[in-house]
Amino acid sequence: ADRGPSAPLVIVFHGYGSEKSQMLPEARALLGLGLSVLLVDFRGSGGSSGDYTTIGVREADDVAAAVSTAKACLPHAKLVLYGQSMGAAAILRAVHERQVAPDAVILEAAFDSLLATVRNRFAAMHVPAFPSAELLVFWGGWQYGFNGFAHNPAEYATSLKCPALFLHGRGDRRVSVAE
């Protein structure tokens, strides 16, 4: 929803296993604050083409494409990127690798590295993480053409040059506060 050329635009990116309609409560809250909102489905999610995700690696290209389109349509609008989990990782990677330069970011339940988050998922299921987590990260990266061990949103965050709001809760069963 466009609230006019002077309203900041918030581009909202969903998490893994989700799609943009699940971000409607957040979008409604942002609209209630007078902001313009654009909801995006990552490749392989919701109404987008593709049949797999890369937990933020290739999705960073989707972030960059959404930002490019938004800047072309609303060149004077302040730009805020909001991402949940994988969406937060994709935003951080886009800033780091694609030189995306938002005016601010909101990062909810961001994980620090792909390997750490996979290990934590195994632990949450009460399954030994080693060597399964390492094999999963290796295999997933190999299968989809990237180095999963190098996917480190915490490292990408060092490239942020804008205000950042990190949201996280102790009750999150998927991403630990330590991450």
Regions found by a protein language model. Give the residues of each.
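Conserved alpha/beta-hydrolase "acid-adjacent" motif
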Residues: R173-E179
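Alpha/beta-hydrolase active-site loop
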Residues: Q22, T53-L74
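Conserved alpha/beta-hydrolase
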Residues: A27-S49
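Short beta-strand/loop motif that positions the catalytic acidic residue
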Residues: S159-K161, F166-H168, D172
